Each structure stands twice: as structure tokens, then as C-alpha cells.
UniProtKB/Swiss-Prot annotation:
<dbReference type="GO" id="GO:0004659">
    <property type="term" value="F:prenyltransferase activity"/>
</dbReference>
<feature type="binding site">
    <location>
        <position position="431"/>
    </location>
    <ligand>
        <name>dimethylallyl diphosphate</name>
    </ligand>
</feature>
<keyword id="KW-0031">Aminopeptidase</keyword>
<feature type="binding site">
    <location>
        <position position="116"/>
    </location>
    <ligand>
        <name>substrate</name>
    </ligand>
</feature>
<feature type="binding site">
    <location>
        <position position="435"/>
    </location>
    <ligand>
        <name>dimethylallyl diphosphate</name>
    </ligand>
</feature>
<feature type="region of interest" description="Disordered">
    <location>
        <begin position="1"/>
        <end position="33"/>
    </location>
</feature>
<dbReference type="GO" id="GO:0004177">
    <property type="term" value="F:aminopeptidase activity"/>
</dbReference>
<feature type="binding site">
    <location>
        <position position="288"/>
    </location>
    <ligand>
        <name>dimethylallyl diphosphate</name>
    </ligand>
</feature>
<keyword id="KW-0808">Transferase</keyword>
<dbReference type="GO" id="GO:0009820">
    <property type="term" value="P:alkaloid metabolic process"/>
</dbReference>
<keyword id="KW-0637">Prenyltransferase</keyword>
<feature type="binding site">
    <location>
        <position position="219"/>
    </location>
    <ligand>
        <name>dimethylallyl diphosphate</name>
    </ligand>
</feature>
<dbReference type="InterPro" id="IPR012148">
    <property type="entry name" value="DMATS-type_fun"/>
</dbReference>
<feature type="binding site">
    <location>
        <position position="129"/>
    </location>
    <ligand>
        <name>dimethylallyl diphosphate</name>
    </ligand>
</feature>
<dbReference type="Pfam" id="PF11991">
    <property type="entry name" value="Trp_DMAT"/>
</dbReference>
<keyword id="KW-0378">Hydrolase</keyword>
<feature type="binding site">
    <location>
        <position position="108"/>
    </location>
    <ligand>
        <name>substrate</name>
    </ligand>
</feature>
Length: 440
């Protein structure tokens, strides 16, 4: 483009006007209310974007991100730090902005984007998180058909600013779980065309940043579907094979065997893998599954690994799940592909966390919320926070949700809060996260 772009679009307005002194930097004297997204508006006055795609991504994501940082009680300094990091590092790798009629590389994060926001809630407070698939325009025009190169370019930039990021596992696991340059060279054009046609979503990597008050924790998700189509193995076999390839001393083998036994019993072939981008000796591996049979009985079966997890944390967590499932009114039944496409319904998901020295895998359940009115979800969450010693979250959850979707009718909307994930330990209590979809 000839010129660079800055300034906020004229129709962007402040939504929620509550703020506190330490978050806004105000003196505390009687003044006009300060909008929650003031940091976004302020930075917009000083940011230049080299193209319209980055400009649109900034104005699409940053207002909600700014509000979440205020709601999470981040200091004013960290609010600006994390918003700047989004503008400088993340927005440049979100790819062409997906507009109607524009034939560009597609990802389904947040429902229809290459980026997704989520919040984690614990008794200690809330944490804002951002997940995205690094992508550049080359993936849309055929130069990088499987979007293999953008993630490496992103990590080279991230490591300059976040010194704690260690990408050793990225290199080790990519070889086992993603289509490599060598794999692509070994496939003929007919095979490549088949994979490009069969996989409407070609995502192989997703990066997630936990924006903690103590600093950033980076995670990477590996989706082995395309690799498995080329090699003939199942996703679950690929994930466990990759773990064993990097866990050469076998610290995780007994945990893997426990999960594998359940997968075999339940006939689960598809899976994907996540790890923390830290020293490999200290990382957590998480094996994920999705199941279109959305029933409480099926969720219970997966939560307990078919009865293999009988510890106190699993038992207490299961009782809480039963209550939440009933109160929320999770839409149940076998989920056909047409329901996912036409009605926007989602499967249940779980992950199983493993770490060296851990005796048992730790399950986490993702309950699909699409199809349930947003205000109903918010009321259930508010009551849950009240029961489980999270009074600050209970007080503001409904108000915050409305601020994220300003002007939207949350009594009628059913597709903004997409997932509720839940885990439990006696030490920390309930661990919940809400994953948000963007308005269509």
C-alpha cells in the first residue's frame, strides 16, 4: 500500500466505562469515566501498520484484549506491554484478514479467524490468553500450501523479546507430527492436490501465549492430520510416538500407556498434541481428543479414562462436571458433520496432561457451549463462582461479557462463548477457561 494506516475507525466506541486507578493510571479524583479499552485507543494514536490486514486485525482483536487485561487486574504497564506485543509480533503473522468473498487461507480459531481469545479463572484470579496460527499471504497463493514456514518466522521474533521461550521441542516434534519439506517433496502432485482438497482447514501448528502477570508462557499445538494422511498412521499413534521420541528415558511411558489403553478401548484414532515451549525436561505434554458423541456418560468415560482414574481429584472433579453439565443444559446427542457446519454445534473435547514425575494423567474436559444463550451461561458461571469462593469473578462476569460484545443481544446470541474447559485439583480447586468466538 502507498501509505501506512493508523487511528481508530470512526465507529469504534468505548464500551464499558468502569476502571480502577491502578489499572488506568488516573489520579482517582472525580472525572469522566475512563473506558476499559483506553489503552487500545491510546496506542492506536501512535501505531502505524504497513498494510490493511494488520490494521484490521488490530482493530478487531485489540479492543476485547484490552478489556480482558483490565478485567484481569493487570497493571497499566502490563496492559500496554501485552497490547504492544500483539501489535508488533502477533498481528503481522495473522495473515490476510478474512473478509466475505476473499479467498484466503482459512483457520477456525475463534470460529472463523486465525486468532482466538480466552480467559482462565481460578481462585487466584483470571489470566488472559491468546491463541493463533502464524500465517502469511504465501499460504493463500500456493507458495506455502500447507503453511509450514510462518511459525518459524514468528518464533525467531518471539525469542528476541521473551527470553524464556525454548523452541527445542518445536523442532523435535514437528518432524513427527507435521508435513515436513521432505514429506512434501516425496508426494506427487496428485497426492498433494488430494490433501489440499480433503483438508478444508490445513492447520498444522497453533501457538498460544498465556499472558500471565509473571510473564509470558508460550505453548504450541501440533495437529497431525495431514502428516497422518501422508504416512498412514493414526493421530493418536503419531502423538504418542512423538512423545516417546523426545522422552528417551521413558519418564512418561506409564502415563502414555494408561491413556493409550483407553483410546484403544474407546476406538479413538484422532488426537493432537500440545507442549509448553520450555526446557523439554520441564514441559507438560497434553494429548487432546474430540468426540462427536456429546453425552454426559461419554464425558464421564473420557474423564476417568474408562474407570482407570479413581483418585480423589478425578472423583471430586467428576461430581462438579455433572452439576455444571446439567445446569448449563449442554446440547446432547451424536453430532453429525452437518450439525457442526449448519448449526455451529461443537463436540466434547478432553486433554490429558503428563509431566515427568507425575503419577497419573490430569484430565481436562471441554464442554461445548454453542447453542446455549449467552446470558444463561453467564448466570450459571456467576452462581458457580459464588459457590466456589470466587466472589470477585461472580460480581463482574455478566458485566464483562456484555462489554466484550457491545451492542449484541446476549439473551438471543448462542455462539460467543464456545467452550468451557474444566479441571480440578484439591490444592487449587476448580480451574476453568472460557474460549470466545468472534461475532459473525
Amino acid at each position: 500500500m502507498d501509505g501506512e494506516m493508523t487511528a481508530s475507525p470512526p465507529d469504534i466506541s468505548a464500551c464499558d466505562t468502569s476502571a480502577v486507578d491502578e489499572q488506568t493510571g488516573q489520579s482517582g479524583q472525580s472525572q469522566a469515566p475512563i473506558p476499559k479499552d483506553i489503552a487500545y485507543h491510546t496506542l492506536t494514536k501512535a501505531l502505524l501498520f504497513p498494510d490493511i490486514d494488520q490494521y484490521q486485525h488490530w482493530h478487531h482483536v485489540a479492543p476485547m484484549l484490552a478489556k480482558m487485561l483490565v478485567d484481569g487486574k493487570y497493571s497499566i504497564h502490563q496492559q500496554y506491554e501485552y497490547l504492544c506485543l500483539f501489535a508488533q509480533l502477533v498481528a503481522p503473522v495473522l495473515g490476510p484478514y478474512p473478509s466475505p468473498g476473499r479467498d484466503v487461507y482459512r483457520c477456525t480459531l475463534g470460529g472463523n479467524m486465525t486468532v482466538e481469545l480466552s480467559q482462565n479463572f481460578q481462585r487466584s484470579g483470571s489470566t488472559t490468553r491468546i491463541a493463533f496460527e502464524p500465517v502469511r499471504y504465501q499460504a493463500s497463493v500456493g507458495h506455502d500450501r500447507f503453511n509450514r514456514t510462518s511459525v518459524n518466522a514468528f518464533f525467531s521474533q518471539l525469542q528476541l523479546l521473551v527470553k524464556s521461550v525454548n523452541i527445542e521441542l518445536h523442532h523435535l516434534l514437528s518432524e513427527h507430527l507435521t508435513l515436513t519439506a521432505k514429506d512434501e517433496r516425496n508426494l506427487n502432485e496428485e497426492q498433494l492436490t488430494k490433501y489440499l482438497t480433503n483438508f478444508q482447514v490445513k492447520t498444522q501448528y497453533v501457538v498460544a501465549l498465556d499472558l500471565r502477570k509473571t510473564g509470558i508462557v508460550a505453548k504450541e499445538y501440533f495437529f497431525p492430520g495431514i502428516k497422518c494422511a501422508a504416512t498412514g498412521q493414526t493421530g493418536s499413534n503419531a502423538c504418542f510416538g512423538a512423545i516417546r521420541a523426545v522422552d528417551k528415558d521413558g519418564h512418561l511411558d506409564s502415563l502414555c500407556q494408561l491413556i493409550e489403553a483407553h483410546f484403544q478401548q474407546s476406538k479413538i484414532d484422532d488426537a493432537f498434541l500440545c507442549c509448553d515451549l520450555v526446557d523439554p525436561a520441564h514441559t507438560r505434554f497434553k494429548v487432546y481428543i474430540a468426540d462427536p458423541l456429546v453425552t454426559l456418560a461419554r464425558a464421564e468415560e473420557h474423564w476417568t479414562l474408562g474407570g482407570r482414574l479413581t483418585d480423589e481429584d478425578a472423583a471430586v472433579g467428576l461430581e462438579i462436571i455433572r452439576g455444571l453439565w446439567s445446569e448449563l443444559g449442554i446440547i446432547q446427542g451424536p453430532l453429525e458433520p452437518s450439525a457442526m457446519m449448519e448449526k455451529g454445534l461443537l463436540p466434547i473435547m478432553l486433554n490429558y496432561e503428563m509431566k515427568a514425575g507425575q503419577r497419573l494423567p490430569k484430565p481436562k474436559l471441554y464442554m461445548p457451549l454453542t447453542g446455549i444463550p449467552e446470558t444463561k451461561i453467564a448466570r450459571i458461571m456467576t452462581a458457580f463462582f459464588q459457590r466456589h469462593d470466587m466472589p470477585e469473578q461472580a460480581e463482574v462476569f455478566m458485566e464483562n461479557l456484555q462489554a466484550y460484545y457491545e451492542g449484541k443481544n446476549l439473551e438471543e446470541a448462542t455462539r460467543y462463548q464456545a467452550w468451557l474447559s474444566f479441571a480440578y485439583t484439591k490444592e487449587k480447586g476448580p480451574y476453568l477457561s472460557i474460549y470466545y468466538f468472534w461475532p459473525e
